Amino acid sequence: MTTVSPRPRMARRALDGVLLLDKPVGLSSNDALMRAKRLYQAKKAGHTGTLDPLASGLLPLCFGEATKFSQDLLEADKTYEATMRLGVRTTTGDAEGDVLDTRDVSCDEAAVRAALARFVGEIVQVPPMYSALKRDGKPLYEYARAGQTVEREGRTVTIRALALVSCALPDVTFRVTCSKGTYVRTLAEDIGEALGCGAHLTMLRRTGVGPLTLEHAVTLDALDAATQDERDARLAPVDALLSTFPCVKLDAALATRFLHGQRLKLSELAARPDAAEGGRVRVYDADDRLLGVARASEGVLAPERLVVTGA
């Protein structure tokens, strides 16, 4: 009897960096993460907030030490390009849902532009029933699938910018930059109601997360076809997540103290960081290796998160 030896497990690699992935429609964020993690044979990886399966676009993936800073992207503003169809409301607020009602579309482009302008700034959104937001420990979409509607409190979000991209009625494409927690489906529905005809979302593509943009992203198919060296070259450094923070450079002695978690007096530094009181700062050694992030407060630089490898 012939025995078949089990295939040896491929060794996992300790990678540090950020992959800007262009997620396709139809794939969940977790599935995209696992595919990328397998391709890179990475020991540790995580994403920076889910992107709905029906949405495409920028999904930053963090490897190794970069996972320590993924929360910063969770909190960051997001930019999307979206298309809505006026005159039709659906159960889910997008093209996957059943049609609730249809109405005539009597507005013109000028009315659309005026409606968009009304939604810039702080607005209150009622989260959609088809969402992962939980009520009594249960996702809202589970109630919705059971035919139940539960009361949801409105939440304040901020629309930083909202611009018309194209208007081919009944289809309207817009670009929006918004704070975390914004539901673009709900935004489309609310714009439709403001126009008196209702609307649902037919396309959603994320083009920006904080300082990161889609133009530098790569698809899973391209990664699959690439060599390992080519894949590795696509990884951005850990500090790509932190580019909006001011920075400070430490000499060897101060760097050693910082990496041991010691607080440093700002007066000890060769140059003070250009940070507001209580602001966060990127910290580097004399060779421009990232040591971590600190908070500058009351004349002291206090370590907040350390990068073990100096990636």
Curated annotation (Swiss-Prot):
Active site: D52
Gene Ontology molecular function terms on file: RNA binding; tRNA pseudouridine(55) synthase activity
Ranges in coiled-coil conformation: none
EC nos: 5.4.99.25
Gene3D superfamilies in UniProt: Pseudouridine synthase, PUA domain
Source organism, top-level taxon: Bacteria
Catalytic reaction equation(s): uridine(55) in tRNA = pseudouridine(55) in tRNA
GO BP annotations listed: mRNA pseudouridine synthesis; tRNA pseudouridine synthesis
Entry keywords, A to Z: Isomerase, tRNA processing
Enzyme class name: isomerase
Known function: Responsible for synthesis of pseudouridine from uracil-55 in the psi GC loop of transfer RNAs.
Annotated family: Belongs to the pseudouridine synthase TruB family. Type 1 subfamily.
This protein's name: tRNA pseudouridine synthase B
Originating organism: Burkholderia mallei (strain ATCC 23344)
